[in-house]
Amino acid sequence: MAGALVRKAADYVRSKDFRDYLMSTHFWGPVANWGLPIAAINDMKKSPEIISGRMTFALCCYSLTFMRFAYKVQPRNWLLFACHVTNEVAQLIQGGRLINYEMSKRPSA
């Protein structure tokens, strides 16, 4: 059973359909876009004082907009959708870190 599954996957990878997919914007667009969530995830190790609230908000709006686009476009671009879901989560975490940092700077009453 596993051998048949591996053979089927290998046949698909060698197919013209797969090569066409690799040469399309449905593949390379999301690959290039993965830089945003990777950078956000990498920045989680850094101090929250470097987080830009405006940029975080803009990237949240951007990812929400393009999540919808990736879902609505035909054929659906699941790679782009996954990229924007990951970026949305990463940006929301960064936004939460910024809010916690700003709240901790305020003097308690």
From Swiss-Prot:
Chain ranges on the Mitochondrial matrix side, renumbered to this chain: 2-20, 72-109
Chain ranges passing through the membrane: 21-41, 53-71
Major location category of this protein: mitochondrion
Keywords assigned by UniProt, alphabetized: Acetylation, Membrane, Mitochondrion, Mitochondrion inner membrane, Transmembrane, Transmembrane helix, Transport
GO MF term list: pyruvate transmembrane transporter activity
A GO BP entry: mitochondrial pyruvate transmembrane transport
Membrane topology, as annotated: Multi-pass membrane protein
Keyword Signal belongs to the record: no
Location relative to the cell: Mitochondrion inner membrane
Catalytic activities: pyruvate(out) + H(+)(out) = pyruvate(in) + H(+)(in)
A Pfam match: MPC
Modified residues (N-acetylalanine): A2
N6-acetyllysine modification, residue list: K72
Family per record: Belongs to the mitochondrial pyruvate carrier (MPC) (TC 2.A.105) family.
Subunit structure: Homodimer. Forms heterodimer with MPC2. The heterodimer is the more stable and dominant form.
Designated name of the protein: Mitochondrial pyruvate carrier 1
Protein source organism: Mus musculus
